[in-house]
């Protein structure tokens, strides 16, 4: 009996070891290239491959210029993911440029499908993430420095300098997904019931409604 249990345990360990890589990020590619056909009506867990591929499919110039930060958050995210850069389809990577006005922030958010690592191009940023145990890890970073945000954890960046700031972000997914906490809760469609949010945040319903109004 003990011998059988040992073999069962060993078999389970092998299965888990083989399955682990597939759980780490996007699925492995099965061909050299598969440039996304964004116009295809076929919707898979990803995008189908387009028939005619050129070198331009693997080129993206969108990160070289600053984005427009004239908005309430004072920041702009320029994405180089599969939706704007079809050549990364099936490759399990993507990038973004984030620009911040003085005092601007990339509000608290999560990426459910990817870890994020940033390289600071210019400026002074306070960055941080919060674990599932509600512990905050925060750091002030400047040009040339790097910080990493673990997959799925709430994180943010705040410009603490007197001038603009910018970073280049990289992700281990072709489409990392972004869920901004405030917009998710206060600008959902259909809306999250105000009494639900009032109880969660321990405030009154009119206060919740006032916050919701700011997102309209």
From Swiss-Prot:
Per the record, the major location class is secreted
Q: Which organism does this sequence originate in?
A: Oryza sativa subsp. japonica
Q: List the disulfide bonds.
A: 34-49
Write down the SUPFAM superfamilies for this protein, in alphabetical order: RmlC-like cupins (SSF51182)
What is the annotated role of this protein in its UniProt record?
A: May play a role in plant defense. Probably has no oxalate oxidase activity even if the active site is conserved.
Where would I find glycosylation on this chain? Answer: 52, 76
Which GO cellular component does the record give, naming just one?
A: plasmodesma
- What is the official name of this protein in its record? Germin-like protein 1-1
